[in-house]
Amino acid sequence: MVLLSAQNFKRNDINHKLTNQINQLTANAFLHEVVSPTVETTISENGFISYILIDNQIVASGFGKEDTYNPTSKYKTMYIHTFSTKKEYRGRGLCKQLVNEFIKKFGKTHILYLTVRTETNDVNKSAIKCYTNCGFIMLPDVYRNHYDGKNNAMIRVPTSVRKASLKKKKKKKSKKIK
């Protein structure tokens, strides 16, 4: 098993055989026409992709894209999405490995967020468990009705941001006590 990642490639640098495998994996995993960006678009436009190879075949993949919509934001954010695993490889911790690759690469400097379909579905229950085990928390009041049903937001805040936030709260409490 090999875990590979790619970031900010130019379209000419991309191995089209691999991207076709990833696009097919994504389409099969989601069981419908995928609206999400293709591999080429994702990693050539400030994006990141991780995928797992077993016997020269891509069996799991996930995408990430740095959020550039709010340049005045105090913290960098990255939207991670479209985690897919071939059916016969599910339950082996591959999604967790992919999510941890994003955390390793961006978790100290970025707030990571995703949306996950929360309607009853065993695959999504497993996905939510995976994300929760990787340090994401569900934001129950932040959801939208998407083409595939109700989706909730999940977020993982870098340790440095959490520590800074706790220090501010302690300072406010100590000022109130005086």
Predicted regions, residues:
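Conserved N-terminal entry element of GNAT/NAT acetyltransferase domains
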Residues: M1-K17, S160-K168, K173-K178
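A short, internal acetyl-CoA/4′-phosphopantetheine-binding micro-motif in the GNAT/acyltransferase core
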Residues: H81-R90, E119-N121
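Conserved acetyl-CoA-binding loop-helix of GNAT-fold acetyltransferases
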Residues: T85, G91-K104, K129, N133
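Short, high-confidence coil segments that cap the C-terminus of an alpha-helix
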Residues: G47, K108-I111
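Short hydrophobic/aromatic beta-strand or adjacent loop that forms the aromatic wall/cage
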Residues: G47, G149-I155
